[in-house]
Amino acid sequence: WAIETKQFYLMEGTNLNEVSQKLQKIAWNLESDGGLVLDFSESWHRKVGNFFIKRDSLIEYKKICWSKGMLHHDDVLFLSLKILEKNNRIIDILRAKFPYIMIDEFQDTSLIQSKIIKQIAEKETIIGVIGDECQSIYEFAGASVDEFINFHLDGIRLFKIEENNRSTVEIINVLNHVSKDSKLNQFSPDKRGGDTPKILIGGIHKAYKYAKDVVGESPLLTLAYRKDNPNKLKYGVKSIDNEALKLNLLFEDDDRGRKIYYVIQSIEYGKEGRIKDALKSMLKAYRKDLTFKERESLKNLQTLLNEYSNIENLSLTDFYNSFLFGHFNTHQKITRGKRKEFYSSVFYKDIACTVDLHETNSLFRTIHKSKGDEEQNVLLVIENKKSFDEIKELKFLLNPSINADEDHRVYFVALSRAKEKLFINIPSLSEENKIEIEKLNLFVIDYLE
């Protein structure tokens, strides 16, 4: 693609990784005149090093992907709209087959999806949409909260459900504060009271232990914006840049690093019961070994899963030398040099943290994966790092603007999962903001030693 579009500067070694990440951010957008354009969601995403990706080259990238049978969900929507625009008969067939269409979670609908729905609704088919503007959290996937707020069809009727049968009065009060600029004000029909939500000041591991001690045997759902925070708690890993470690493996040590990463990914998928995905990852790990087929993939996965208790606490050096070296044409040990120093300082669990699991039953999840769920007790972990920006990260409490700021809606989703007890963890709190939070009369603030 870079060669065909004469963007040779993108092929420099230091740029390859960044280009790969940036291309994942392109999406089809609906313009005000109804036309479709392929572009980055943010203009700065075009920048790679000191250069910019040409906008008119993006369609060429898509064509290459399509020629290889690679379709993104976004492409499916784009092509669906194109098909409907070229053949009105298809819309007639859809109307005849679906006289009634009910769409849940409509606040997460993209502009393209909304346009398709409006075309179908022009006659015959009756459309019903259900949603909550406060829970529109998929802007990165093309969703627009304004599209939901302003959605209109001829003869539309509006119904509101303001009763909250899930949470205590104390938690509902927090939700109403965070969502105060929306049109929805919730209440508890049975006025069920409970504990005042707590803000825990300190590290995530201390906060988790504190919350677990409070809830006892009752389940504690731990949520965070980024997947590495709940994963670090799940695996007992301290604060390190796990994503940087992952990229180091994939791009700095060629085949060996990739093999280690994809084998670990395979094992973690296997633990989750996603055997099909686990086998795909194992095949990726040994892709250059032409004798390594699905049978070998399954055999290796089974062996490594059986050894999990012996693997999970190893450094990457020990994991590689003990369980990968000597098997399936892996001939070279890690014995010396800078790579040995690196692999000896990184542990299996550090990399396991980066594997994007789809666990729906896990008590350690990202906020986005908790949509639609509920739990007795919830611990929300706010970005917990040395560069913690208190003003930015606490704005959803100190100066909420839920319609304008998607981050505030994401945190609203997390808070609204809680039924009985709610904890919010932040690493630090200034005296000034402590006073402002106390004025809200919504939280108890606890400093963890």
Task: Identify the residue ranges that each predicted region occupies.
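The feature marks helicase ATPase cores and/or their adjacent C-terminal helical subdomains
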Residues: 1-449
